[in-house]
A protein has these predicted regions:
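Long, aromatic- and glycine/proline-rich binding clefts that accommodate carbohydrate-like moieties
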Residues: 316, 366-422, 426
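Hinge/lid segment of periplasmic solute-binding proteins
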Residues: 50-51, 119-172, 310-317, 386, ...
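Glycine-centered hinge/linker elements that transmit conformational signals in sensory
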Residues: 203-204, 239-270, 318
Length: 451
């Protein structure tokens, strides 16, 4: 039964996450298939020459949060073992401003990245618009890669008919919880079918505001998605609507929790730069909405003994509004691309093909993370990962129903993202009221959409 649930979950997740593409852009690369083939042949000749002289080729890969992502080094080690003439150099650009830093690197002079990680849709849109990513279609065709294994993801990230990235990680949001806090309070664990009202009441029942003994019933990271995207789970609204009145009840819930000490103060979190993993690791957070990308970090840090206050954890499905199907949640993919400036495009493609394929998927799954493709072996690896919670609710939480993108495809997604982030920050810090912040979103995003 567990295996069937996981299989269904992964298949559905990857279909929905496939929507995480990018819209058309007049600024896309003018590189033709012929140019790409010629460049690939030249790169292949260079690689062959290096092999004959015994020299190693270095592939430079941009990533973020190396220390918190255990599958990075495992992927690199496996690829280097299959390619002893290659060294993969990871460059950590940090998670906070990753896409901004990457765009600066790729549009500046002297960038020597061969493979770049794509973190989100707005960042992808920006890079495609700037013409700094290589079209992958000729590589895919010549390699015989079956794009159907991505369950529609590849088709959804095409720009003007061309594909500039290939996904290798697929993530969705769940509710993490610390069982020890519930046990100490004598409160039953959260379930896979909670309305927001039930969730809010549960968080309040676990909260302790005594100075020095604080227990937070809930925790929200400083990303706008941790609050705003509660409002899109009904399938009727998107974050591109241009009118955001539907967000008011969710902001009211979180602001009231913040005022009552149910969750930590946003401004304090922002100033201190406390990472969500650090907050949960302290052992005084009962529930935290976060993505499945946290699985691998949590499992690894507990295994190494770095996390000692949150070892008894579980997950359940996202809370939902009345009338919304349980298991409705948010989805996001992480992809790989080749910069047009790379001198090793053919080898970079081999690396991408490895990470995005079956072998890479099994390595990712072995750490508890969810890859972009699913097979029986991948499902077995996820379900049997040491440290992954084995209670029925945690397994069932992986069986999602409806998935919605954090940021849907749009040519101006980056501008919209900026406007929404600014308004979110103003609301959460108290710089403006909820009504004023929503009015700001309505005005600014509507103007962007009308351009």
């Amino acid at each position: 039964m567990k295996k069937r649930a996981l299989s269904f979950m992964l298949a559905f997740t990857m279909v929905a996450a496939g929507l995480a593409g990018c819209s058309s852009s007049s600024g896309s690369s003018d590189t033709t298939a012929a140019d790409t083939t010629a460049a690939g042949s030249e790169a292949a000749d260079t690689t062959a020459a290096e092999e004959s002289t015994g020299e190693k080729t270095t592939l430079k890969w941009s990533v973020w949060d190396i220390s918190a992502t255990p599958y990075y080094q495992l992927l690199v080690d496996a690829f280097e073992e299959k390619h002893p003439d290659v060294t993969v150099e990871m460059v950590d650009l940090g998670s906070t401003d990753y896409q901004t830093v990457l765009a600066t690197e790729l549009t500046g002079s002297g960038s020597d990245f061969d493979v770049v990680s794509i973190k989100d849709v707005p960042g992808y849109t920006t890079l495609v618009n700037k013409g700094v990513l290589e079209p992958l279609d000729s590589y895919i065709e010549s390699s015989g890669v079956d794009l159907t294994q991505y369950k529609g993801i590849a088709d959804q990230v095409r720009v003007d008919g061309q594909l500039y990235e290939l996904p290798y990680i697929n993530s969705f949001w769940v509710l993490f919880y610390n069982k020890d806090i519930f046990d100490a309070a004598g409160v039953e664990y959260p379930t896979n079918d909670m309305t927001f009202e039930e969730y809010d009441a549960l968080a309040r029942s676990l909260t302790v505001t005594t100075p020095g003994q604080e227990v937070y019933g809930a925790h929200y990271h400083t990303w706008r998605s941790a609050v705003q995207l509660f409002g899109v789970l009904d399938g009727e609204h998107t974050i591109l609507d241009g009118n955001y009145d539907f967000l008011k009840p969710y902001y009211e819930m979180v602001i009231n929790e913040q005022n009552d000490g149910v969750c930590q103060d946003y401004a304090t979190l922002k100033t201190s730069g406390l990472h969500y993993s650090g907050a949960f690791a302290q052992g005084n957070v009962a529930m935290m909405n976060q993505g499945t990308w946290f699985f691998s970090t949590l499992i690894e840090k507990i295994k190494t003994g770095e996390y000692t206050e949150c070892t008894n954890w579980g997950i359940v499905k996202y809370p939902h509004a009345e009338g919304v199907e349980p298991g409705s949640t948010l989805s996001q993919i992480t992809s790989l691309a080749i910069p047009t400036s790379s001198d090793n495009k053919d080898l970079a493609w081999e690396f991408i093909q490895f990470l995005s394929g079956e072998e890479g998927a099994e390595i990712v799954a072995s750490t508890g993370a969810i890859p972009a493709i699913m097979s029986d072996s991948v499902v077995d690896l996820i379900s049997s990962t040491e440290g992954f919670p084995q209670d029925e609710n945690s397994i069932e939480a992986l069986n999602t129903s409806n998935l919605y993108l954090e940021m849907p495809v749009h040519a101006k997604s980056s501008e919209i993202e900026t406007a929404l982030n600014e308004a979110h920050d103003s609301i959460m810090t108290g710089s403006c009221t909820i009504d004023e912040g929503i009015a700001q979103m309505n005005e600014q995003v509507s103007a962007i959409l009308a351009e």
